Swiss-Prot record:
Pathway annotation: Cell wall biogenesis; peptidoglycan biosynthesis
Record-linked Gene3D superfamilies: 3.40.50.20, ATP-grasp fold, A domain, ATP-grasp fold, B domain
Domain ATP-grasp, residue spans: 109-309
NCBIfam families given in the database record: D_ala_D_alaTIGR, PRK01372.1, PRK01966.1-4
Co-factor note (free text): Binds 2 magnesium or manganese ions per subunit.
PROSITE patterns for the chain: ATP_GRASP (PS50975), DALA_DALA_LIGASE_1 (PS00843), DALA_DALA_LIGASE_2 (PS00844)
Gene that this sequence comes from: ddl
Binding site for Mg(2+) 2: E276, N278
Name under which the protein is recorded: D-alanine--D-alanine ligase
Pfam family, one: Dala_Dala_lig_N
Cited InterPro entries: ATP-grasp (IPR011761), ATP_grasp_subdomain_1 (IPR013815), D-Ala_lig_Van_CS (IPR000291), D_ala_D_ala (IPR005905), Dala_Dala_lig_C (IPR011095), Dala_Dala_lig_N (IPR011127), PreATP-grasp_dom_sf (IPR016185)
Positions bound to ATP: 136-191
């Protein structure tokens, strides 16, 4: 009997179009001999089609497992994961805690710092911060200004001076009340995919070669000019270090299922820094998460099979857990 897989995509987020593209790739990649797919589309106003998944156990007997493909807020941040927990439905990817912590760049950095993982020096501000320049005095230029809870480089700017810092702050606070300002790292941009629950494994890393000053939304999805190298041209020891740190970061934030961990390798110092972790990475034709696994020996269809099995396995583990006396 075929497994019935519900794919949720779209959403109220600046990454709506990326979600749609990722979902199309996943729907095309799921083996029709193994799976029957059900599409749940969420428009940019939050309306579900054909209708919302309701938070009542047993209300969705036609669904065996859910594959959320919602990038960014209202989907990658624990909100949909909480809904699926209430509905007692197995789902692909991190749980509520791992999703929420990973989505919030400040919380992710706090957890990594507690685990003594290498992170870039940063300052946290809010929309109400009276002077962004004063708040960031201890950081040298250039700086990166980022909404704390968005992905796909939406709302991110690189500031080289105080005037650009003010403009970057004005842009970022349109997307989030909390903003992260980081010391700019001049170096290589590297990524590593992680897969698994209790015993996660890391792929071979890749390198992003932006066509612009940094790998922003336009470079990722619109210009189609950025180049990638899979696997990255790195010494074996550095590759091993990236894979180890990717798994350590994954475990630190209590991730499950899948994630992509992004790194900077700084010129001059040759130091490696964890940039961020993405719990629902892109699955578009240009997305690096599946590409890294393909180069590590796991083809796209097999990757989807494994993600679904991890989701079902986690749900089976919960069925033997007592939640009441």
């Amino acid at each position: 009997m075929k497994l019935r897989v519900a794919v949720i995509y779209g959403g109220r987020t600046g990454e709506h179009e990326v979600s749609v593209r990722s979902a199309k790739s996943i729907l095309a990649g799921l083996d029709c001999e193994k799976y029957e797919t059900i599409e749940y589309f969420i428009d940019q106003n939050g309306k579900w089609s054909p209708g919302p998944i309701l938070p009542e156990p047993g209300a969705h007997a036609n669904i065996d497992v859910v594959f959320p493909v919602l990038h960014g807020t209202f989907g990658e941040d624990g909100t949909v994961q909480g809904l699926l927990e209430l509905a007692d439905l197995p789902y692909v990817g991190a749980g509520v805690l791992g999703s929420a912590v990973s989505m919030d760049k400040e919380m992710m950095k706090r957890v990594c710092k507690e685990r003594m993982l290498p992170i870039v020096d940063y300052v946290t501000v809010t929309r109400q911060t009276p002077s962004i320049v004063d708040a960031c005095r201890r950081l040298p230029f250039p700086m990166f200004v980022k909404p704390a809870n968005l992905g796909s480089s939406v709302g991110i700017s690189k500031a080289h001076d105080e005037q650009e810092l003010e403009a970057a702050f004005s842009l970022a606070k349109q997307y989030d009340r909390k903003i992260i300002v980081e010391r700019g790292i001049e170096g290589r941009e590297l990524e590593c995919s992680v897969l698994g629950n209790e015993a996660p494994m890391a792929s071979l890393p890749c390198e992003i070669l932006p066509s612009r000053e940094f790998y922003d939304y336009e470079d990722k999805y619109l210009l189609d000019m950025a180049r990638t190298q899979v696997p990255a041209d790195l010494p074996g020891e550095r590759t091993d270090e990236i894979r180890r740190l990717a798994v350590e970061c994954y475990r630190a934030v209590e991730c499950e299922g899948m994630a992509r961990v992004d790194f900077f390798l700084e010129h001059g110092t040759n130091r490696l820094y964890i940039n961020e972790i993405n719990t629902i990475p892109g699955f578009t034709s240009i997305s690096m998460y599946p590409k890294m696994w393909e180069h590590s020996g796991i083809p796209f269809c097999t990757l989807l099979d494994q993600l679904i099995e991890f989701a079902l396995d986690r749900h089976r583990q919960k069925q033997v857990t007592r939640f009441a006396r």
